[in-house]
From Swiss-Prot:
[4Fe-4S] cluster binds at residues 385, 389, 392. Binds 1 [4Fe-4S] cluster. The cluster is coordinated with 3 cysteines and an exchangeable S-adenosyl-L-methionine. PANTHER family: UPF0313 PROTEIN YGIQ. The keyword Acyltransferase does not apply. Its cofactor is [4Fe-4S] cluster. GO terms for molecular function: 4 iron, 4 sulfur cluster binding; catalytic activity; iron ion binding. Residues 371-640 form the Radical SAM core domain. It comes from the Bacteria. This is UPF0313 protein PA4928. The keyword Iron applies.
Length: 747
């Protein structure tokens, strides 16, 4: 892997003399107070501006400020006109546009395509403060305001839509976001390196159209430049020329080949022979090789080609060996440079050590921003995830190589949070990242890591080259909880339990000191079919971890419970799989509080399965095995009903399905049955989805969540089966006795 220029080695821009601002300005008045006559760079974002390293606009803004640039923020502008996009004036260098920390469509719509009633990234949690496809709208308004100013597109929405992608909300393949956004260049993934490099080059007078060699960027060009070797991957199932089958009954002396051999003339002198070049171009280095994907027009009309393109894209994600990609859109090409080089520990410390205020901008007054409230007292210790779950975008966006901060940097941030953030009570709500326990876990050999093309380091089993030592993380936990003024360090990030069982010492440390009653883990399913499509470990690994968790909890004298996450309707899931999951849930005393159906997000491997019915984890052909897909609303409701098998509202649907599946034996009023024969009046039943507002009650076994909200579970009656008395009351009610009283239905 080629070395990258360290972020702190660039010369500072002349405006460094102004020094860091208390907050990056959001108005002309703030610019005047700072003594600025203009901004060099203006960041437009769909989120409220929170000056905290968990928010993208703060990290990019502070990093550019540290390079000497004057950076302004336009947060959640009114997109109905260009006026809000002009309130800070014309930027000297460029507009940086991002939809926010989430894809704007996922932020606004549920997996069932219903409009959400709130937005966690807006003051007061109000919905409707950003448009659908915000990256497109903001980019177009910036160009409308100042047509000659470069627009640089970034953020997770743009990153995952950089290629022709399936759009769940329109149920079609859309072209690259670059073709619709009128942006000049797109930065994908963690964009610190790319944005600093481009800002420096634009400041030196280079045209944005000439910047085509920065890793982690995508842009439009007409043709492949000279000196590049192009690999054609636009088709699949391309057999070579097949030789004619020889008839074994024909006398070889009668064939034309023999006649030619006998009449062959003088042999060519070997001294006069010349080497013939068979390849159109000699093989060049990977740095000068580009893979041509099927065009937008082809993948739009051919789901199998779409799956093939998705497979090639994911095979080219390791920064150590990835090649450039190109995809034709009409008369032009969209070109994708290889992914950015991961940041070193020193660079991570540099980025997270900026002078963040760690609070929302004062312009929001006392209005609370739910996303900030959730991470207010948390610390991010690393980036990246090598799990490779096919339904998740973290690996695609942050990369498979873990980027770690040093212990000193993390401890300094905890101390700063303790001393600066109002309301700190001594409890750090999370010390983690995309995954709680991948800190400093990496391949044993940098050379192997550089050449690896596996989509996951832990599926189908933990790679023998992966160093699963958790000692550095254990040491960090001990240092953090020893700090004066820190009472408790909680771990709220999702735990990769298949890694944790490799280190019993880590599990003991975690369970003894860092669990606040509940610990989130994500088995996602119990059946092998969907788990293989998700690239998740078998349920047996969960059982091993559960044994460890309960053992160490008992030794610590603590009442603690696991909160497992499950997904309904994921590609590869059959009705029988969901039935078996429901039986497992009942057998283990779990009752789902919230239910999440699979959400096809742009560019995810599972989304390619959903759209194409093929499995991109293996070589894709027109004849390759298909994947079971759950698309109809009725079947999605059924799969969610299996997860909430205890909810009377879903019982009619479950009875019908069980009879159709030949499993009517599961309908009855005994403990071994899944659904009862009676149907109580559920008119007063309240949905558990009510805005995630019910506070958590006392700790009880049997809770589980199937939405990855990060919020605490709500109180319920736990996972206890109905008592005989409850069953008798419900049966009597169903038969018409005691009509004046509702049965006590556990929720």
């Amino acid at each position: 892997m080629q070395a990258a220029k360290p972020l702190f080695d660039y010369p500072k821009y002349w405006a460094e003399c102004f020094g860091p601002a208390p907050f990056l300005p959001m108005s002309r008045e703030e610019m005047d107070q700072l003594g600025w006559d203009s901004c060099d760079i203006i960041i437009v974002t769909g989120d409220a501006y929170v000056d905290h390293p968990s928010f993208g606009m703060a990290i990019i803004g502070r990093l550019l400020e540290a390079q000497g640039f004057r950076v302004g923020i336009i947060a959640q502008p009114d997109w109905q006109s260009k006026d809000d996009f002009m309130k800070l004036g014309e930027p000297n260098l460029f507009f940086g546009v991002a939809a926010g920390n989430m894809d704007s469509m996922i932020n606004r719509y549920t997996a069932d395509k219903k409009v959400r009633s709130d937005d966690a990234y807006t003051p007061g949690g109000l919905a409707g403060k950003r448009p659908d496809r915000a990256s497109l709208v903001y980019s177009q308004r910036c160009k409308e305001a100042y047509s000659h100013v470069p627009v640089i597109l970034g953020g997770i929405e743009a990153s995952l839509r950089r290629i022709a992608h399936y759009d769940y909300w329109q149920d079609k393949v859309r072209r690259s976001i670059l073709m619709d956004a009128t942006a000049d260049i797109l930065l994908y993934g963690n964009a610190e390196r790319a944005v600093v490099e481009i800002a420096q080059r634009l400041a030196q007078g280079e045209l944005v159209s000439a910047i085509t060699d920065v890793r982690g960027t995508a842009f439009v060009r007409r043709d492949t430049p000279e000196g590049w070797f192009e690999i054609d991957s636009t088709r699949i199932d391309r057999p070579g020329k097949i030789d004619k089958i020889i008839n074994p009954y024909v006398n070889t002396q009668d064939t034309a080949a023999c006649a030619i051999e006998q009449e062959k003339g003088a042999q060519e002198d070997p001294q006069e022979a010349k080497v013939v070049q068979l390849l159109a171009n000699p093989r060049l280095t990977r740095e000068k090789t580009v893979i041509r994907l099927p065009s937008f027009e082809k993948v739009r009309n051919d789901p199998v080609l779409y799956a093939h393109a998705n497979r090639v894209l994911h095979l080219e994600t390791n920064p150590g060996n990835a090649r450039a990609l190109v995809q034709k859109h009409g008369e032009v090409d969209v070109w994708f440079n290889p992914p950015p080089i991961p940041m070193s520990t020193e660079e991570m410390d540099y980025v997270f050590g900026m002078p963040y205020a760690r609070v929302p901008h004062p312009a929001y007054g006392k209005a609370k921003i739910p996303a900030y409230e959730m991470i207010r007292f948390s610390v991010n210790i690393m980036r990246g995830c090598f799990g490779g779950c096919t339904f998740c975008s973290i690996t695609e966006h942050e990369g498979r190589i873990i980027q770690n901060r040093s212990h000193d940097s993390i401890i300094r941030e905890i101390e700063e949070m303790r001393d600066k953030v109002p309301g700190f009570t001594g409890v750090v709500s999370d010390l983690g990242g995309p995954t709680a326990n991948m800190y400093r876990i990496a391949c044993k050999s940098p050379d192997i890591e550089r050449h690896c093309r596996k989509p996951s380091c832990v599926f189908p089993g933990i790679c023998e080259n992966l160093d699963t030592d958790h000692s550095s993380l254990i040491e960090l936990y001990r240092k953090a909880r020893a700090l004066p003024g820190v009472k408790k360090i909680l771990i709220a990030s999702g735990l990769r339990y298949d890694l944790a069982v490799e280190s019993p010492e880590y599990v003991k440390e975690l369970v003894t000191h860092h669990v606040g009653g509940y610990l989130k883990i994500a088995p996602e399913h119990t059946e092998r079919g969907p788990l293989d499509k998700m690239m998740k470990p078998g349920i047996g690994t969960y059982d091993r971890f559960k044994q460890m968790f309960e053992k160490f909890s008992k030794e610590a004298g603590k009442e603690q419970y696991l909160i497992p996450y499950f997904i309904a309707a994921h590609p590869g899931t059959t009705d029988e799989d969901m039935m078996n999951l429901a039986l497992w849930l009942k057998r283990n005393g779990f009752r789902a509080d919230q239910v999440q159906a699979f959400y096809p997000s742009p560019m995810a491997t599972a989304t390619a399965m959903y759209h194409s019915g093929k499995n991109p984890l293996r070589k894709v052909t027109y004849k390759s095995d298909g994947v079971t897909i759950v698309k109809s609303d009725q079947q999605r409701r059924l799969h969610k009903a299996f997860l909430r098998y205890h909810d009377p509202k879903g019982w009619p649907l479950l009875r019908e399905a069980l009879e159709r599946m030949g499993r009517a034996d599961l309908i009855g009023n005994g403990k071994h049955h899944l659904v009862p024969t009676y149907q109580p009046d559920t008119g007063e039943y309240q949905s558990a989805r009510r805005k995630n507002s019910t506070p958590a009650g006392s700790k009880k076994a049997g809770k589980l969540l199937t939405q990855h909200t990060g919020l605490p579970p709500r109180a319920s009656d736990g996972g206890k089966p109905w008592s005989k008395g409850q069953q008798n009351k419900a049966t009597a009610f169903a038969k018409g006795k005691k009509k004046s009283r509702q049965p006590n239905i556990p929720r």
